[in-house]
């Protein structure tokens, strides 16, 4: 199974696997407003990238 680098997307469950720890820290800044759309500023993509 491929690993996904981003945390966000529409089909979140399987994408939210990787980079969870790092995202949790940055997520606090955006609050609940952008939480769904952005996880990590670096990985702001609409689809997950396979590694």
From Swiss-Prot:
UniProt KW Phosphoprotein keyword: yes
InterPro entries in the cross-refs: Protamine_P1
Disulfide linkage: 7-15, 40-48
BP terms from Gene Ontology: chromosome condensation; sperm DNA condensation
Post-translational modification: Phosphorylated by SRPK1.
Keyword terms of this UniProt record: Chromosome, Developmental protein, Differentiation, Disulfide bond, DNA condensation, DNA-binding, Nucleosome core, Nucleus, Phosphoprotein, Spermatogenesis
Family: Belongs to the protamine P1 family.
Subunit structure: Cross-linked by interchain disulfide bonds around the DNA-helix.
Record-given protein name: Sperm protamine P1
Organism listed in the record: Bos taurus
